From Swiss-Prot:
Disulfide bonds: none
Protein name: Uncharacterized GMC-type oxidoreductase Rv1279
Taxonomy of the source species: Bacteria, Bacillati, Actinomycetota, Actinomycetes, Mycobacteriales
Superkingdom, natural source: Bacteria
Gene3D superfamilies referenced in this protein's UniProt entry, alphabetically: FAD/NAD(P)-binding domain, Glucose Oxidase, domain 3
InterPro entries referenced in this protein's UniProt entry, alphabetically: FAD/NAD-bd_sf, GMC_OxRdtase, GMC_OxRdtase_N, GMC_OxRtase_C
GO cellular component, as recorded: cytosol; peptidoglycan-based cell wall; plasma membrane
Enzyme class: oxidoreductase
Positions of the catalytic residues: 468 (proton acceptor)
Membership in a protein family: Belongs to the GMC oxidoreductase family.
């Protein structure tokens, strides 16, 4: 049976859960939120160190890219959350806002209301930073928001050794989430008492007690219903039936950097020639839908270690420690430390993040490891390469074509930056605090020393996504942008996009924090 609501929100992830929650604070306003996946009842969701067990499960969209020529022709696995909380229910819980300059760059492209000075108040509104490390985070952080953020409870000693090795190599310590967090630090995490705390936990579940909010799970949006030049609802499929939920005011797409552009194109909003290839009538010619795809590529170097890695996280003692005290290895977010560095000294800002995981997180975590190990490597946080999302067919259940075009920039800047980052990692591996803890090279395979050939091999065979796609429904002040600075889709009234797809340029950080920010900002823009 079809239904009506003031607002229809598609997706309940990092941004969608926020939008649905905030819009429903007005008891006179009705909101329906559509989630393709189930409730977040999978037992591994709450256990921080277990997130890779959610890969290719029933709560994962389980995407693959097209073969990447610069990465040995491999198809790269892209997990995306298909569950209440979206990817915030299966990510590594790293709360890394990025640099103030990233948001000022957004403002240059989309107006002053997206500057760091403007969005800082939203971060404070979001965050509930535990008192135990508030002195570390400083006045920039929030302490009364709904999203719990804390220090790690039981980081591994080898993580401390990696940080010490970075310092010995001349890199400074940094305060996490400061306006310019250049340097190295232990990761702060979206956890509460040692368990994952997703946007479903922070925003959606408290709001679901409201009578004016309906959250429909197992409801896959198939297109936006458009009457003339106005969005009037969303068609979705549930239990094998096709239904429509009508929106009296607005439809808000929060389906993420893959699914939001796919939905726009399925609804007739996109490049007219591409839509015609799939016999989709053009509602509005928007050539940039699906373009400007940005992602953070990571290359991991793997090493055998004797002990103290998360390979032992499922041992009985660790299970008991977690169940009784919420301590031990199972509280680990895996990516326990990171640092921002420059591939070239003349750069104004870091273009690389180095990440450390005290775990044998090899082969995109799709193959069970054989023993103890650790990984670390560079992440390209300011890529020059741009990719694209396109339709594979007009079937809404067909996975879209994901073409990130990693390392494809004509000047070779991205490749040079990653190689520079790998050389820094090799230096850190050989520094005194760490070198005696590392055994044989586990990745890339069949390597015995960290020479240039090994680093080149790692770039080709050990690179994968850090799970941060963005930019495919670019926000901007220019007429070519997909959405305007108020997140309204150009050419169609009553339709907005609010998720990582609207980011007009990269963030030198992780996309969860700015996606939550976009959700908060979107709710204010809609209500104003």
């Amino acid at each position: 049976m079809d239904t009506q609501s003031d607002y229809v929100v598609v997706g309940t992830g990092s941004a969608g859960a926020v939008v649905a929650s905030r819009l429903s604070t007005d008891p006179a306003t009705t909101v329906v939120a559509l989630e393709a996946g189930p409730r977040d009842k999978n037992r591994f969701i709450g256990v921080p160190a277990a997130f890779s067990k959610l890969f290719r499960s029933e709560i994962d969209w389980d995407y693959l890219t097209e073969p990447q020529p610069e990465l040995d022709g491999r198809e790269i696995y892209w997990p995306r959350g298909k569950v209440l909380g979206g990817s915030s229910s299966m990510n590594a819980m790293m709360w890394v806002r990025g640099f103030a300059s990233d948001y000022d760059e957004w403002a240059a492209r989309a107006g002053p209301r997206w500057s760091y000075a403007d969005v800082l108040g939203y971060f404070r509104r979001i965050e509930n930073v535990t008192a135990a490390w508030h002195f570390v985070s400083g006045d920039d952080s929030g302490v009364t928001g709904p999203l719990h953020i804390s220090r790690q409870r039981s980081p591994r000693s080898v993580t401390a050794a990696w940080l010490a090795a970075a310092r010995e190599c001349g890199f400074a310590a940094a305060r996490p989430n400061s306006p310019r967090p250049e340097g190295f630090c232990e990761t702060v995490v979206t956890q509460r008492r040692g368990a994952r705390f997703s946007t479903a936990d922070a925003y959606l579940k408290p709001a679901m007690r409201r009578k004016n909010l309906r959250v429909l799970t197992g409801a896959t949006a198939t297109r936006v219903v458009i009457d003339g030049d106005r969005a009037v609802g969303v068609e979705y499929q549930s239990d094998g039936q096709t239904r429509i939920v009508y929106a009296r005011r607005e439809v808000v797409l929060c389906a993420g950097a893959v699914n939001s552009p796919q939905l726009l194109m399925l609804s007739g909003i996109g490049d007219r020639d591409h839509l015609a290839e799939h016999d989709i009538d053009t509602v509005y010619h928007a050539p940039e839908v699906g373009c400007n795809l940005l992602d953070h590529l990571v290359t991991v170097l793997g090493f055998d270690v004797e002990k103290d890695s998360l390979f032992a996280a499922e041992k009985p003692g660790q299970l008991i420690s977690y169940l009784l005290r919420r301590r031990g290895m199972l509280t680990s977010n895996v990516g326990e430390a990171y640092g921002f560095v420059r591939s070239r000294p003349e750069l104004k800002l870091p273009d690389l993040e180095l990440i450390f995981a005290p775990a044998p997180f090899y082969d995109e975590a799709l193959v069970p490891p054989a023993g103890h190990g650790v990984v670390f490597g560079p992440i390209l946080v300011a890529p020059q390469s741009r990719g694209q999302i396109t339709l594979r067919s007009a079937d809404p259940h067909a996975k879209p074509v994901i073409e990130p075009r990693y390392l494809s920039d004509l000047g070779g800047v991205d490749r040079a930056a990653m190689m520079a980052g790998l050389r820094i990692c090799a230096r850190i591996a050989q520094a005194r605090p760490l070198r005696d803890l590392l055994g044989s090279i586990a990745r890339p395979r069949n390597s015995t020393e960290l020479d240039e050939a090994t680093l080149e091999l790692a770039l080709a065979t050990c690179s994968h996504t850090l799970y941060h796609p963005m930019g495919t429904c670019r926000m901007g002040s220019d007429e070519a942008s997909v959405v305007d600075p108020q997140l309204r889709v150009r050419g169609v009234d009553g339709l907005r996009v609010a998720d990582a797809s609207v980011m007009p340029s990269t963030v030198r950080g992780h996309t969860h924090a700015p996606s939550v920010l976009i959700g908060e900002k979107a709710a204010d823009l809609i209500r104003s």
